[in-house]
Amino acid sequence: IENFELIKPNSKFDWLNQRNSDFNSLIKLGNKRNNDALFIEYTGGIKTGRDAWTTNFSKNTVIKSMENSIKYYQDNLGNLEVYNLSTNEISWTRSLKQRFERFQSLSFKTDRLYIGMYRPFTKKYFYYDPDWTDQQYKMSIVFPTQLSENILLSLSNKTEGKELTCLAIDLLPDVNLFAGGSQNLPEFLYDNLGKYSSIRESILNNFNSLTADSVLPYIYGIFHSKEYKMKYFADVSKEFPRIPNLKNKEKFINVGRKLMDLHLNYEEVPIYDDVEIQLSVQPSYKVTKMKFVKKRDENGKLVNDRST
């Protein structure tokens, strides 16, 4: 048979999209099983199990929705028939049912109102109370309070044939920050004594001239490198990302630091001088579905040009 390529599986039994042979020699970023990774801990974003009640662009809407849910919960405490009732007041998850069946009384807590990153560059108000959060993973030691300060590198969890995505955030992340989920590498962790670095010093010592406060910019610069994305495309789609110990670290640190500043402070970027904002007296927010026209014009699409 002509024009056929003989394929042999590699040591990891990959037939197609074979992983790079040197990936295992790179530094692990996270490992739940032992202490051989650069970060002491990494975590998924919070999974509320009831986004329609706990998240919104309006703070008052979140407060009202959660007060109604908690009132409904309290009013029906002890009545297991409530599960069979149709209601818009509450969403029953397994964890909430367990509390309900233990007759656990719950109340609204104003100090659990957070601003979080719901989707990339999309902030919302969150009601982040462990009692009303289906899965919080390790977020309780990353953002234990509203006032907790932290920077996270949020990674796309399942690339599934797409490039690795990495976004620097300084807010509580949703579990589905990216499609397929996200994993987050925090700069700090918190305990009863306060915050401490999440960088494991024993692993950091393997890097020449890399300090703890340069770790995140260094990683950020690497993960936004086209060379890294192309070389380890198959690896990061199947395994947790790793990083190389490069000689020219300062170059990646500088680029990573600039990108982090841009992505963290995107709302403070000055508007272009030539941009004019025109306000309509009677604005229309009706969106017309985009579609291809039968006879293509120079754009090829019919779009709503009243809003962006």
Task: Walk through the language-model features, giving the residues of each.
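Sequence-level detector for compositionally biased, low-complexity segments
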Residues: 1-308
